Amino acid sequence: IYTNSTLIDEPFCKEVVRLGNIAFMLSIEGTPETNDARRGEGHYAAVMHAMDLLKEHGILFGTSICYTRDNIEAVTSDEFMRFLCDKGAHFGFYFHYMPVGNEAAPELMPSPEQRKYMIQRIRYLRSEACDIPFYPMDFQNDGEFVGGCIAGGRNYFHINSAGDAEPCVFIHYSNANIHDSSILEILQSPLFMAYHNGQPFNKNHLRPCPMLENP
């Protein structure tokens, strides 16, 4: 479950332990300054509290990190990686900033040079040359390992808060709702079939996204 952590408390953790089948990916974006600048004042403190609770209760969790042109160094530094390990997280997904919505800020998108840096940095952190016990995965730059874009029902799709089924968390179009359609019906709907038939969107799996790199 991907979460902003704000609803994780002691009773919730006890219920998760009872269930025994849930892991969490906590959204965090570097230092208190870089994190709260994007996610709102007080969010960093909420994540720290959630990490402490999850670690105390022995609940498996990792991180979900959005890297931007401004925070890329803060969220990939050795210091930050070791800090996450100390808090109890040992794996996580990186997502580069995608300009979606009415308040999108395209200027926050990583530069080509920064994307190249991320490719090299993630591979180093996963290598035997690195002694930090944290395993990072990059939603964009690891496309070569999964055959390109995994969205549109190929490996996953997104359900928003209204129940609308969307090809990807970053692509807000839908022609089916989970409340009145089965998973199979959603996957066979015109939008999802068009997505399916378009795969792969680029032979270069380092450029897998149909919205960002192959519009």
Residues covered by each model-derived region:
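Alpha-helix boundary recognition
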Residues: 17, 55, 85, 123, ...
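Short, hydrophobic secondary-structure boundary micro-motifs
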Residues: 63, 134-135, 195-196
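Short, conserved loop/turn and helix-capping segments at secondary-structure boundaries
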Residues: 41-44, 109-116, 176-181
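Flexible mid-to-C-terminal extensions adjoining Fe-S/redox cofactors in radical SAM and related proteins
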Residues: 165, 170-215
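A C-terminal junction/extension of Radical SAM enzymes
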Residues: 97-167, 212-214
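Radical SAM/AdoMet-radical enzyme domain recognition
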Residues: 1-95
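Short, solvent-exposed loop/turn segments at secondary-structure junctions
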Residues: 6-7, 31, 68-70, 98-100, ...
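Generic alpha-helical structural signal
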Residues: 48, 78, 116-123, 184
